Regions:
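Phosphate-coordination loops involved in phosphoryl transfer and adenosine-cofactor binding
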Residues: 12, 84, 140-143, 241
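Rossmann-like adenosine-cofactor binding region
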Residues: 73, 176-283, 409
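NAD(P)-binding Rossmann-fold cofactor-contacting core
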Residues: 163-181
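Glycine-rich adenosine-cofactor-binding loop
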Residues: 19, 113, 121, 140-161
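N-terminal glycine-/charge-rich "phosphate-binding" loop or analogous flexible N-terminal tail
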Residues: 6-62
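Oxidoreductase and adenylate-handling cofactor-binding alpha/beta cores
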Residues: 121-137, 162-163, 309-318
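Phosphate/diphosphate ligand-binding glycine-rich loop within oxidoreductases
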Residues: 63-136
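Rossmann-like dinucleotide-binding domain for NAD(H)/NADP(H)
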Residues: 241-244, 248-412
Length: 415
């Protein structure tokens, strides 16, 4: 697009962005400085804000608003603004956005579905290797139940598949969609089967697995609500040897029922990254958890930055501008950029590989030591850099017997 054409599209854009969006300056600075209006003396601005404390007065003259999940975007926030032309959330969840209100005002909205799915899957894997070491568990003998077969559940499924760990998926929405697609194909006589091939099971079947990992959005009401999906009734049916991992939304588990269960002496092993009532967590529950963290499962550098990239692409599309940047332009090398493996794959090697990139015990320790002095949001804002497996290149020597590291997401040496 020629710069003169751009000047007609963009007039002194004020882009407001959450201060915790990585590479926002790099992605968006040129978009707000393109040429600004016919007189040429207006300047666009790129303005960071603190997500939890954003006010209507602050964003009264925003053209573009880019948030994360802690900012409620609704009439209360936007009633003073009459020029907003784009709202983006650099997150997978959208329950903090009043999409009906935005639609009523014809304000385009974009989120970043799947942006941190890999990060969350790697958090779960790190938790599993930590608990396997702590309790001498053979991961290959466990069955994992995944609640939610969307982006995050699918990435976890892929990693478990790479490790040969048996797992089951419960997702009634996807199961219904699968059945409907099969009906349509049969009715149309379509010889090519394009349906989702996965076998979905009931919630009861998943809750009987050795490990239960939750990956659903918060849904209140409707045919398949997830609000307090795990409650007193089904939590009390779990047995002492099970592991429960929640890295989705805090309201999916009734935290008070979970606390009552543990106070009664139940042996359930709990990994909690999300909490009811964030940022105010049920403090009494923390000592009963194996791993406790501050809603950071999706906080890898890649996961957060992918959200910035997806919103940049969406805004470029709306402005009819060719995207100039991609995430690879900005990602730094990992602290250990490459390793060579000359042994056969084993749980010991898995333990070493996962912890080398991300040891969830670091975040658990920070949470327990600093929650009461720093606060929940501060732990998220000041989260230390964490990379995904893909940041590390793994070379396999010829005598190794499997490419599991690459199937887990570690990079291959480019030829």
């Amino acid at each position: 697009v020629h710069i003169n054409a751009i000047s007609q599209l963009v007039q002194a854009m004020k882009i407001f962005f959450d201060e915790n969006m990585p590479f926002a300056q790099e992605f968006f600075s040129e978009l707000c400085h393109l040429n600004m209006g016919h007189n040429g003396d207006e300047q666009g601005e790129l303005i960071p804000f603190s997500g939890r404390t954003l006010t209507a007065e602050q964003v009264a003259d925003a053209d573009v608003l880019l948030v994360r999940s802690i900012t409620q975007v609704n009439e209360q926030l936007l009633h003073l603004n009459d020029k907003l032309s784009f709202v983006g959330s650099a997150t997978i969840g959208t329950d903090h956005i009043d999409q009906h209100y935005l639609a009523k005002r014809n304000i385009p909205f974009h989120s970043a579905p799947g942006c941190n799915a890999i990060s969350v899957a790697e958090y779960v894997l790190s938790a599993l290797v930590v608990l396997a070491e702590r309790y001498l568990l053979d991961l290959s003998s466990l069955t994992v139940g995944i609640v939610g077969g969307g982006n995050t559940g699918s990435r976890l499924s892929e990693k478990l598949l790479a490790l040969g760990i048996e797992h089951k998926i419960c997702d009634p929405l996807l199961a219904e969609k699968q059945a409907e697609n099969q009906r349509q194909q049969q009715a149309q006589g379509d010889p090519i089967d394009r349906t989702d091939k996965r076998k979905y099971v009931s919630l009861a079947e998943v809750l009987a697995c050795d490990v239960i990992s939750l990956h659903v959005p918060k849904v209140v009401g409707g045919a398949h609500p997830t609000f307090q999906l795990l409650n007193e009734e089904n939590l009390t049916q779990l047995h002492d040897e099970q592991i429960l991992i929640s890295a989705c939304r805090g309201d999916v588990i009734d935290n008070h029922a979970l606390l009552a269960l543990k106070q009664a002496g139940h042996g359930l092993k709990i990994v909690l990254d999300v909490w009811q009532g964030e940022p105010d967590v049920l403090e009494a529950l923390i000592p009963y958890t194996e791993i406790a963290t501050a809603h950071i499962a999706g906080y890898s550098l890649e996961g957060k930055a992918r959200g910035s990239e997806m919103l940049y692409q969406a805004l470029c599309q709306q402005l009819k501008i060719e995207p100039k940047y991609q995430l690879a332009n900005f990602l730094p090398p990992a602290s250990i950029p490459a390793i060579e493996i000359n042994q056969n794959f084993s749980q010991i090697l898995l333990n070493q590989l996962v912890k080398m990139v991300y040891d969830v015990r670091r975040d658990d320790a920070i949470f327990r030591q600093q929650l009461f002095t720093q606060g929940f949001d501060s732990l998220r804002k000041n989260y230390p850099v964490r990379r995904e497996f893909s940041a590390v290149t793994v070379t396999l020597s010829p005598n190794t017997d499997s490419d599991v590291p690459h199937r887990l997401g570690f990079s291959k040496m480019s030829n």
